[in-house]
Amino acid sequence: MPIKVENVSFIYNEGTPYATVALKDINFSIDDEEFVGIIGHTGSGKSTLIQQLNGLLKPSKGKIYINGIDITDKKVSLKDIRKQVGLVFQYPEYQLFEETVFKDIAFGPSNLGLSEEEVKERVYEAMEIVGISKELADKSPFELSGGQKRRVAIAGILAMRPKILILDEPTAGLDPKGKQEILNKIKEIHDKYKMITILVSHNMEDIARIADKIIVMNRGKIELIGTPREVFREAERLEKIGLSVPQITSLARELRKRGVPIPPDVLTIEEAKEHILRYLRGTKNV
C-alpha cells in the first residue's frame, strides 16, 4: 500500500496538564491513484491527521508507511518524504511571500538542488497545470484574485512533483465560481497525473462528486470509511455526529418516506431523475 496508517494516536501537549487527544487508534490504507476525501466537523482531527502524513507532526503512538517506508522511524529523512508528499494548507495564499508569481512557485524546486533551467521548466509546467497564464509570471502574487492566489500556492507544491497531493480545505473562503474552478482543476490534475490525492473538506457535495473513498472523522476517530455510496447510505449516522449529507441524498430519503422507491445511496441529480421517472412511468401503467 502506498499509504498505510496503523494504530495512530496523537496527543497535543503530551505529558502536561493541557494534554489533548487529537487522534485515537486511526487505521486505514490508500492505494495508488486513489482520490480520498476526509470529512468531519471542526475539531474532528482532519488537519491533525494529514499533518502526520508528511511528518509535520509525529504520532504519539502507531506507525505510518509511505510507499513502504515507516516515516515514524527516526532514521528516515523527512526531507525526502516531503518531496513525495505535497501538502497544501488551508488558505495557502497567506503563505505567498515572493515578489513575483514565478519566484513564489520556484521557491520549493530551487531548494532541491536543481539547475536554473530545470527549475524554470518545473515552474512553467506547474503554472500550465493549474491554469495560470505565463503572462502572470512576473506579476506580484498579491495583485491576483483569491482563486488565482490559491492556484499559485497549489502550483508551488506541484512544482516539487510530489507523488501524493494533500489539500486542506482548498476552497475555503472562495466565492462559488472560484470554488468550482479550484475543485475542477484538482480533479483534472488527479485524473491526468494519477497521483494519490487527499482532499480535506466539510462539504459533502464536493466530496461526493469527486472522491473514490471517504474517511469520516469524529472526535479524533474514524467514524466511517468507504466509497461515497457506502458512506452516504449512513445518512442518519452522519447527521447524529453533526454532518449533513448531499442535498440529493436528503431528497431521496424524503421521497422514500413517501413511497417513491429511490435507493439510499443516490449521489447525483441524474440518478435521482432516472429513478423518479421510472417510478412515474410505473404508476401511470397501473
Swiss-Prot record:
The keyword Nucleotide-binding applies. Its EC number is 7.-.-.-. It holds the Pfam family ABC_tran. Residues 3-244 form the ABC transporter domain. ATP binds at G40, H41, T42, G43, S44, G45, K46, S47. One of its GO terms (cellular component) is ATP-binding cassette (ABC) transporter complex. NCBIfam families: ECF_ATPase_1, ECF_ATPase_2, PRK13637.1. This is Energy-coupling factor transporter ATP-binding protein EcfA2. It comes from Caldanaerobacter subterraneus subsp. tengcongensis (strain DSM 15242 / JCM 11007 / NBRC 100824 / MB4) (Thermoanaerobacter tengcongensis). The lineage of its organism: Bacteria, Bacillati, Bacillota, Clostridia, Thermoanaerobacterales. The gene is ecfA2.
